[in-house]
From Swiss-Prot:
It comes from Laticauda semifasciata. The record marks 91 as: Specific activity reduced 20-fold by modification. It is an enzyme of class 3 (hydrolase). The lineage of its organism: Eukaryota, Metazoa, Chordata, Craniata, Vertebrata. The active site is at residues 75, 119. Expressed by the venom gland. Keywords: Calcium, Disulfide bond, Hydrolase, Lipid degradation, Lipid metabolism, Metal-binding, Secreted, Signal. Binds 1 Ca(2+) ion. This is Acidic phospholipase A2 1. Residues 1-21 form the signal peptide. PLA2 catalyzes the calcium-dependent hydrolysis of the 2-acyl groups in 3-sn-phosphoglycerides. It is found in: Secreted. Its EC number is 3.1.1.4. Belongs to the phospholipase A2 family. Group I subfamily. D49 sub-subfamily. Disulfide bonds join 38-98, 54-144, 56-72, 71-125, 78-118, 87-111, 105-116.
């Protein structure tokens, strides 16, 4: 084997080892991200909502800082209701239609329908709510009491 081939093989192996340390996102969160992009027509990348205010992102506490943060609290509460129904919202996959002017859930019943409705309402709420850069990546220990 040529030395150049060994270097390429080594680089591939090292990169694969690094990739195994990255935990996968729950499948529904990837789908939710795509639904956000569908509703807002790509005007703001989904990751902007992952660390916004007190409720957008993992966890949540205190009083929402603005309308957009209230959207996230409502979404968290909706997922809480789904869990009470025995659903696993972060892992529940559903189908939706993005080809129309008004995106909608193709799945209407059961856990899939409920979780899709949670995500669709949140995505619509995000699209109509102003985004304040000052509320991105805030110190939640000080502002979310």
């Amino acid at each position: 084997m040529y030395p150049a081939h060994l270097l390429v093989l080594l680089a591939v192996c090292v990169s694969l080892l690094g990739a195994t340390a990255i935990p996968p996102l729950p499948l529904n969160l990837v789908q939710f991200s795509n639904l956000i992009q569908c509703v807002n027509k790509g005007s703001r990348a989904s990751y902007h909502y992952a660390d916004y205010g007190c409720y957008c992102g993992a966890g949540g506490s205190g009083t929402p800082v603005d309308e957009l943060d209230r959207c996230c609290k409502i979404h968290d509460d909706c997922y809480g209701e789904a869990e009470k129904m025995g659903c696993y919202p972060k892992w529940t996959l559903y189908t939706y239609d993005c080809s129309t002017e008004e995106p909608n859930c193709s799945t209407k019943t059961g856990c899939q329908g409920f979780v899709c409705a949670c995500d669709l309402e949140a995505a619509k709420c995000f699209a109509r709510s102003p985004y304040n850069n000052k509320n991105y990546n805030i110190d939640t220990s000080k502002r979310c009491k």
